[in-house]
């Protein structure tokens, strides 16, 4: 499909406006979630090393920041989190370096709303002024016609092509391929469009997959779901747990 050049600015404007509205509707502002909630969740994450996410929002990022703050204050000693973005390329922008700089990592398998690419360079925007909301920083990037890097929903082969076109996303998926030990998944459906993730886990040295199941189905539906996921990993051990028992999102479980 070809677009007339005169329609392109209008299309770009509509995409930007739609993206901002989506972020505003789905992403909580800092004032909506207290710091003690993020710190409590950071404590619940204590047993995890690398965390892989396919979510685009920055909720998990705020949890790892809370984790690092607790360590800096010497309230906890849980091991710092990083996400591979450490190189200061300009004010408020960090370029990707490596996942091995910090002992624990948050890895965005499908990228995130605050990760952008300009002239082939992938960078993460970060706050210089703590009072500024991330949505405002994202708005500035959009106003400069810079759009977030993200792997859109669609066919598995299309997703895989998008990942291979971006250095950071390739490194993120390769990190999953090279992992070992047990893998706990939470809120991930292992759908057909995420075959690249299933393939990465199957090619890794992961020994056991512990997958969450939300029990809002009939017994036969749950049985079918368990069988479907188990069959995706013929050479791995697969176990399941009730997703409601994993984390406490309604109130801080730990007081800080």
Regions found by a protein language model. Give the residues of each.
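Extended, H/D-rich, highly charged conserved domains that either
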Residues: 1-9, 41-164
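Short acidic, glycine/Ser/Thr-rich loop/turn "cap" segments at secondary-structure junctions
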Residues: 18-26, 41-48
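Alpha-helix capping at helix-to-loop junctions
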Residues: 21-28, 65, 69
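Short, flexible loop segments at the rims of nucleotide/cofactor-binding pockets, characterized by
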Residues: 24-32, 158-165, 186-189
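A short, well-structured juxtamembrane/interface segment
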Residues: 27-43, 165-176
């Amino acid at each position: 499909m070809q677009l007339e050049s005169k329609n392109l600015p209008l299309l770009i404007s509509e995409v930007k406006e739609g993206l901002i509205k989506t972020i505003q509707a789905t992403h909580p502002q800092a004032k909506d979630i207290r710091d003690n909630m993020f710190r409590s969740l950071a404590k619940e994450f204590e047993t995890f090393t690398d965390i892989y996410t396919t979510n685009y929002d920055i909720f998990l990022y705020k949890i790892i920041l809370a984790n690092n703050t607790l360590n800096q204050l010497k309230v906890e000693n849980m091991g710092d989190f990083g996400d591979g973005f450490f190189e200061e390329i300009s004010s408020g922008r960090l370029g990707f370096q490596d996942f091995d700089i910090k002992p624990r990592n948050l890895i965005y398998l499908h990228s995130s709303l605050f990760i952008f690419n300009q002239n082939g360079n992938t960078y993460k925007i970060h706050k210089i002024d703590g009072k500024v909301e991330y949505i405002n920083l994202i708005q500035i990037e959009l106003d400069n016609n810079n759009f977030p890097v993200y792997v859109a929903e669609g066919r598995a082969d299309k997703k895989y092509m998008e990942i291979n076109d971006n250095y950071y996303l390739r490194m993120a998926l390769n990190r999953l391929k090279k992992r070992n030990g047990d893998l706990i998944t939470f809120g991930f459906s292992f759908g057909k469009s995420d075959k690249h993730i299933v393939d990465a886990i199957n090619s890794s040295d992961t020994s056991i997959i512990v997958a969450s199941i939300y029990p809002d189905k009939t017994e036969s539906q749950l049985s079918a779901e368990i069988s479907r996921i188990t069959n995706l990993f013929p050479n791995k051990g697969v176990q399941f747990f009730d997703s409601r028992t994993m984390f406490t999102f309604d109130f801080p479980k730990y007081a800080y």
